[in-house]
């Protein structure tokens, strides 16, 4: 029965459970860091520059080699789903990178909708996560996944509704998962309320 559920999930989302866990972890870690603006001066020149790029949807697009390198060099690299350059091309993943900064995300076509994937911020610039998600939505993102916790309210306020929830399964835990620090949170799959399949 478990295998049947995994096959059904894969057919519906084009993801395997371990990939979903990795993406959920990264989304959670990104926002744990980027939503906190207390560490970075609100008007630092770098933050203002990054937000100007993001708010104007000004990105380097589809530079797959650079995008793959940024994911590989992320401090959360071991928790990320790494896409090879040829895989990104084959899946037609659209990548968006802030010029001059290792910040970006990808959009991946699903059978129904577009998944926000590979969200990363390899800089020390904080407080840009909300603008990054707003931009991903403007550019067509309709779905995402994350671990249950503080992001649940954030994504609800952004217009994402839960459509599926997985109980934690140790079998799919990312390598090196710190149970003492992160526990065993549910994985929540969300889509925009305005999304119509």
Explain the meaning of each model-derived region.
Residues 14-124, 135-143, 152-158, 165-197:
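Non-catalytic substrate-recognition and accessory regions of acyl/acetyltransferase enzymes
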Residues 147-148:
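Helix N-cap/beta->alpha junction signal
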Residues 127-129, 133:
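Extended non-catalytic interaction/regulatory regions in multidomain proteins
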Residues 1-12:
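Short, intrinsically disordered N-terminal pre-domain segments
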């Amino acid at each position: 029965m478990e295998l049947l559920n995994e096959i059904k999930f894969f057919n519906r989302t084009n993801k395997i459970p371990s990939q979903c866990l990795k993406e959920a972890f990264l989304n959670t870690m990104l926002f744990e860091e980027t939503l906190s603006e207390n560490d970075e001066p609100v008007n630092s020149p770098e933050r203002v520059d990054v937000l100007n790029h993001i708010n104007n949807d000004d990105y380097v697009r589809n530079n797959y080699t650079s995008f793959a390198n940024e994911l590989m060099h992320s401090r959360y690299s071991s928790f990320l789903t790494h896409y090879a350059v040829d895989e990104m091309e084959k899946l037609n993943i659209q990548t968006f990178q802030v010029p001059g900064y290792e910040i970006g995300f990808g959009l991946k076509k699903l059978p129904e909708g577009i998944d926000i994937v590979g969200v990363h911020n390899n800089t020390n610039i904080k407080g840009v996560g909300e603008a990054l998600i707003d931009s991903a939505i403007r550019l067509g993102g309709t779905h995402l996944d994350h671990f249950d916790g503080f992001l649940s309210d954030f994504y609800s306020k952004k217009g994402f509704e839960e459509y599926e929830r997985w109980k934690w399964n140790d079998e799919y835990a990312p390598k090196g998962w710190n149970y003492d620090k992160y526990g065993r949170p549910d994985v929540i799959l969300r889509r925009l309320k305005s999304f119509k399949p």
